Design a protein with these regions (language model features):
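DUTPase catalytic domain/fold
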Residues: 1-173
Length: 173
């Protein structure tokens, strides 16, 4: 896996200076797992965090589009990632878009082996309003989560549990 020379220079600078609070623009300290990100389109915007304590990285729309009332669209970001093995990228809504505009994000799982365009399925819940997305708008966020690997084993019977087969509201309201 090859890291872009500009990113290597940024990492080196941060390690040498230990500067974190006075970095310009969207340059953040490199203190986590490196996740290589590739622009599939020169117009794409790389994911960013507004604050160091934010859980997710904002994802940006690659192009202008309009979502009709009670409709959904797949929005391209123009980027791909090499998420490390043992992790997954989860696509989540941005709370402001949901609250202010009724725009939701359908669940997305970006597996470590996926190398294509990270697309976001946006849903407009408004009955009468169209929603316009502009190129460069923040449309969702990606959160990285460590995952465990399991081996599924077929059995004839499962151990009993207190809940049993109760589901879909069986635990009360």
């Amino acid at each position: 896996m090859e890291i872009h020379p500009d990113e290597l220079a940024r990492i080196k600078m941060l390690e040498e200076t230990k500067v974190t609070s006075s970095l310009p623009g969207n340059i953040k300290p490199w203190n986590g797992h490196p996740v290589p990100v590739k622009k599939l389109d020169p117009a794409a915007t790389l994911p960013t965090k507004a604050n160091d304590t934010d859980a997710g990285y904002d994802l940006y729309a690659l192009e202008d589009l309009e979502i009709g009332p009670v409709n959904q669209k797949l929005v391209k970001t123009g980027i791909s990632m090499a998420i490390p093995k043992g992790y997954v990228g989860l696509i989540w809504p941005r709370s402001g878009l949901a609250y202010k505009h009724g725009l939701d994000v359908f669940a997305g799982v970006i597996d470590a082996g996926y190398r294509g365009d990270i697309g976001v399925i946006l849903y407009n819940s408004k009955v009468n309003d169209h929603y316009k997305i502009k190129k460069g708008d923040r449309i969702a966020q990606i959160l990285f989560q460590k995952i465990e690997d399991f081996d599924l084993v077929e059995v004839d019977n499962l151990d009993d549990s207190q809940r049993g087969v109760g589901g879909f509201g069986s635990s009360g309201s």
